[in-house]
Design a protein with these regions (language model features):
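Short helix-capping segments at alpha-helix termini
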Residues: 33-37
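Short, internal strand/loop/helix patches
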Residues: 54-90, 94-95
Length: 117
């Protein structure tokens, strides 16, 4: 129910993925700017080692929901969502319709901004 009627950013990443880790600072800024305006972020890790995943969350100071089945790319949730490479993002509108895939940086923030208005 926390997700109902909100814009959702689903972020697929991993602790060992340098571009993913670099993008986390952008996600943090987006989170701070939009968390009180109707944005929910859920990050899904492609890690297979729980300790590395948890350490990356701490190091990057990621306050939103973090999930992982610890099965990596090509298995489990990654296979279910057809994740071939990371970072990968999905933006869902308030009605849970996918409105954008694969955005990063400024383009990601602009799309979220439009979806929330």
């Amino acid at each position: 129910s926390e997700l109902k009627g909100k814009v959702k950013l689903i972020d697929f990443w991993a602790s060992w993925c340098a571009p993913c880790r670099a993008e986390n600072s952008n996600l943090l800024r987006i989170y701070e700017n939009y968390k009180d305006k109707g944005l929910v972020i859920v990050s899904i890790s492609m890690d297979t080692h729980k300790k590395a995943w948890e350490e990356a969350i701490q190091e990057d100071k990621l306050p939103w929901l973090q999930l992982s089945d610890l099965k990596g790319i090509g298995k489990g949730i990654a296979r279910q969502y057809n994740i071939q490479s990371i970072p990968q993002t999905y933006i869902l509108d308030a009605e849970n319709k996918v409105i954008a895939v694969g955005l990063r940086g400024k383009e990601l923030e602009e799309t979220i901004d439009k979806a929330i208005r």
